Structures are given as structure tokens and as C-alpha cells.
From Swiss-Prot:
This is Uracil-DNA glycosylase 2. It comes from Streptomyces coelicolor (strain ATCC BAA-471 / A3(2) / M145). The keyword Cytoplasm applies. It catalyses: Hydrolyzes single-stranded DNA or mismatched double-stranded DNA and polynucleotides, releasing free uracil. It is found in: Cytoplasm. Its main location: cytoplasm. The active site is at D67 (proton acceptor). It comes from the Bacteria. Belongs to the uracil-DNA glycosylase (UDG) superfamily. UNG family.
Length: 227
């Protein structure tokens, strides 16, 4: 249950110790009990999909989300992203609108953000599982301790990164990041509740300027249409 093999290989050295912590064992027992009682998203094999898609040494940007999508077949373990064929959710629609206004990138027909992850954008939710139909149902069960360890691991690397903290929840993680070494892009959350402040904040330009300043290839934010 807490075998190190559950983690993608590139993350094992920096996160393996977390799996031995009492909180993590309790967390895994809780998630298994939840799965025994009904649907939990994402499926087991996609819980660590964000870490799988963006290896530790390739992280250029870390975008912090909150909670997985709680609808059937929506999420696949990357924050803000949905599977091909799933309707683009409101927050991601607003991200696309800002991207289009800022960079003139076409608004895609899908919400599958794997092209970002493959370029080094770690799309990390603070909580990695959720009960079907119940947002925040796995909050404060231990996932936050684990994902704080992910943030700290990236922040401890010699190679600097860009941390994207949208909204008050994400910005509570600021103490985990040394702003003298890394760049933090802060702003309003793209949710419809705060989108007015999000629009015009030009996060994608800020991120790419920082990425280039750190000596890395900027991110191509274009998401291809899947038809």
C-alpha cells in the first residue's frame, strides 16, 4: 500500500520518505476504505499522474490547484485538466480566455493539458483524491502534507523554478518557497467567482519571462484541437 513503487521513478528519492510516515499510511487506509464504499476520483492508477507526466528534474513551472474534479470521468490527476471529450470546466475556460487575450493562442476544443505537463509544467492539486460528487471530501486527510513535500522538494532543487499560485488557498503555500531563489507568480483564481481580477493579469507572459530568465525554453501554451 505504501510501497515506493507507487511513485514515479524520478520522484522516489525526494518523496520516498513520505511514504513511510504514519500520516501517509493512515491516508492510504482512508482512501482504500473510501474506494470500498463508492467511487473515488481519479482512479488508482492516475492518483500520481501529475508526477508521472512531469519528472522531478524536468519541472520548470509548478501550478498549484486545490481538489480533483469530482464528476465521473472528468479528471485524470492533473490540476485544471480534463480527459479528451469532456466539456471544458469554467475555471479552465477562463484560463483559455486569458491566454487568448494575452498571447493570441487559439481557444482549443478540449481541456486536456498534457502538452503543458510534457514541457515541464507540474499541474499539482493539493489534494489528490475526492469522493464522487463531493468537492473537498478528502481535504485535511493527509494529502496536503504529501503535496507540501512535493512543493518543498522542487523548492529545494539547485535549479530554480516558477511557482504559480492562483487564489488565496494556493498563496498559503508561499512560506514553503524561497522567493530569493525562485519566481512566484501570484494572482486571482480563474474561477468564475474571481475571474474579473484574473483577466488581464498576464500570468503566461510572466511565467515565460521567468522561465527564460532561468535559462529554460519558454512554454508553448498552445493546446492542440483534438477534433
Amino acid at each position: 500500500m505504501t510501497d515506493i513503487a507507487m511513485l514515479p521513478e524520478s520522484w522516489r528519492e525526494v518523496l520516498g520518505g513520505e511514504l513511510q510516515q504514519p500520516y501517509f499510511k493512515e491516508l492510504m487506509e482512508f482512501v482504500e476504505e473510501e474506494r470500498a464504499n463508492g467511487p473515488v476520483y481519479p482512479p488508482r492508477e492516475e492518483v500520481f499522474a501529475a508526477l508521472d507526466a512531469t519528472p522531478f528534474d524536468r519541472v520548470k513551472v509548478l501550478v498549484l490547484g486545490q481538489d480533483p474534479y469530482h464528476g465521473e470521468g472528468q479528471g485524470h490527476g492533473l490540476c485544471f485538466s480534463v480527459r479528451p471529450g469532456v466539456k471544458v470546466p469554467p475555471s479552465l475556460r477562463n484560463i483559455y480566455k486569458e491566454m487568448h487575450a494575452e498571447l493570441d493562442t487559439p481557444i482549443p476544443d478540449n481541456g486536456y493539458l498534457m502538452p503543458w505537463a510534457e514541457q515541464g509544467v507540474l499541474l499539482l492539486n493539493a489534494v489528490l483524491t475526492v469522493r464522487a460528487g463531493e468537492a473537498n471530501s478528502h481535504k485535511s486527510r493527509g494529502w496536503e502534507l504529501f503535496t507540501d513535500a512535493v512543493i518543498r522538494a522542487v523548492a529545494a532543487r539547485t535549479d530554480p523554478a516558477v511557482f504559480v499560485l492562483w487564489g488565496n488557498y494556493a498563496q498559503k503555500k508561499l512560506p514553503l518557497i524561497d522567493e530569493a531563489r525562485h519566481v512566484v507568480v501570484k494572482g486571482a483564481h480563474p474561477s468564475p467567482l474571481s475571474a474579473k481580477k484574473f483577466f488581464g493579469s498576464r500570468p503566461f507572459t510572466q511565467i515565460n519571462e521567468a522561465v527564460a530568465g532561468q535559462g529554460h525554453e519558454p512554454i508553448d501554451w498552445t493546446i492542440p484541437n483534438l477534433g
